UniProtKB/Swiss-Prot annotation:
Domain of life: Eukaryota
An example molecular function term from Gene Ontology annotations: zinc ion binding
Source organism per UniProt: Homo sapiens
Record localization: Endosome membrane; Lysosome membrane; Presynaptic cell membrane; Cytoplasm
Name of this protein: E3 ubiquitin-protein ligase ZNRF2
Record's compositionally biased regions (Gly residues): 30-41
Pathways per UniProt: Protein modification; protein ubiquitination
Residue ranges with Low complexity bias: 19-29, 59-97
Post-translational modification: Phosphorylated; leading to binding to YWHAE. Phosphorylated by MTOR at Ser-145 and dephosphorylated by PP6C. Ser-145 phosphorylation stimulates vesicle-to-cytosol translocation.
InterPro entries: Znf_RING, Znf_RING/FYVE/PHD, ZNRF_ubiq-protein_ligase
């Protein structure tokens, strides 16, 4: 009997220590007090040993942990929106700063943008005839447009392609007419009887037995050399002024 009576007392002692709200009321009967004491003991044991709680309640705890982990991520959207607004304001400020320095349209000038695109330093702006400085006048002479011997106004003269002489621009027309209409020099064909030095055209030795051409100025050359020379020139290689 003593052991049976000590059981509820010990349970009531534990109930008072851990959970006072689970004690039965003073107006309850003895049987109800005993049942209440047993329920309080079970509640105290459940609070003291949480590992004995059924597994059906565990998903709710994990769901609560997931909700708690997801809760701090909510303010990220306003922060991203605030960053986007800052970037947009910076970009609009940059556009506003660049607006006073807009480049004018190159096609609004006297010469369109097509000329500037297709022009180069060599052709002098597309090779078009434009007045110098925008003033009315004749076509502009571009450097490199003509060979050196055909640009008399730039070099003060030209080299005659016939006689290889430099002639002033004032005498250019007359000199060309004279060179082109001048009769071809005739020569006497002969056989060299002895060595006579070197040929001024091919720079080879004139040896005995070679067929030579003797010009009116008494200059002698290889016949083949002087024939090739006369195909381009109409004067003696050593006396171009004659």
């Amino acid at each position: 009997m003593g052991a049976k009576q000590s059981g509820p007392a010990a349970a009531n002692g534990r109930t008072r220590a851990y959970s006072g709200s689970d004690l039965p009321s003073s107006s309850s009967g003895g049987a109800n007090g005993t049942a209440g004491g047993g329920g309080g003991a079970r509640a105290a044991a459940a609070g003291r040993f949480p590992a004995q709680v059924p597994s059906a309640h565990q998903p709710s705890a994990s769901g609560g942990a997931a909700a708690a982990a997801a809760a701090p991520a909510a303010p990220a959207a306003p922060r991203s929106r605030s960053l986007g607004g800052a970037v947009g304001s910076v970009a609009s400020g940059a556009r506003a700063a660049q607006s006073p320095f807009s480049i004018p349209n190159s096609s609004s000038g006297p010469y369109g943008s097509q000329d500037s695109v297709h022009s180069s330093p060599e052709d002098g702006g597309g090779g078009r005839d434009r007045p110098v400085g925008g003033s009315p006048g004749g076509p502009r002479l571009v450097i490199g447009s003509l060979p050196a011997h055909l640009s008399p106004h730039m070099f003060g003269g030209f080299k005659c392609p016939v006689c290889s002489k430099f002639v002033s621009s004032d005498e250019m027309d007359l000199h060309l007419v004279m060179c082109l209409t001048k009769p071809r020099i005739t020569y006497n064909e002969d056989v060299l009887s002895k060595d006579a030095g070197e040929c001024a055209i091919c720079l080879e030795e004139l040896q005995q037995g070679d067929t030579i051409a003797r010009l009116p100025c008494l200059c002698i050359y290889h016949k083949g050399c002087i024939d090739e020379w006369f195909e381009v020139n109409r004067s003696c290689p050593e006396h171009p002024s004659d």
